[in-house]
Amino acid sequence: MLENFVKVADMPQEVIEKYKDQVPAELVQIWQEDGLGTFLDGYLKVINPDDYLELLQDSYFRGDVAFPMFVTAFGDVITWEENAYVGIVQYNIQDLDIMIKRMDRFIEYVDDEDFKDDYFDIPLYKKAVARYGQLAYDECFGFVPLLALGAFKDVEHMDKLKTLEHIYLMYQLTGGVMDD
């Protein structure tokens, strides 16, 4: 279903069964046809929601109505929220954004240049890949030190980090993404 998808594993069948009635049909189709892996040249990863759900609920003020679907190369979590729209939780800058209503529209526009410019930092990602190499499935690029602690948003101040651990660290040091 996703173009240029690089599969790393099947989505566990028990996960599909557990969530199939709570998520959009398109996501279930991705899980069944594509599984776990990367797309958009490695920028986005299809994740096992069980790995991120508790973290999202604890670290995001809308975590009770958000479901983790994807994670970006910078540790942002793409969510399905209120059974209606796709959002992005940006732990690096303690912010969130509503990307688009309806999952089918997200899939349609995810590779659109304007959409990518609005929500993803593809140029910085390409520079990071050129300098540090491709990410492993469980890695993201993280800023060192964290942006909240004074790092500059450039490739000289980043490194490859384990995605889940990095998001937990950002949450612990910044308090997560809360409604101010």
Language-model segments: what does each one mean?
Residues G87-L124:
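Compact, glycine/acidic-enriched structural inserts
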Residues K7, P12, P24, N92-D95, ...:
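Serine/threonine-rich low-complexity intrinsically disordered regions
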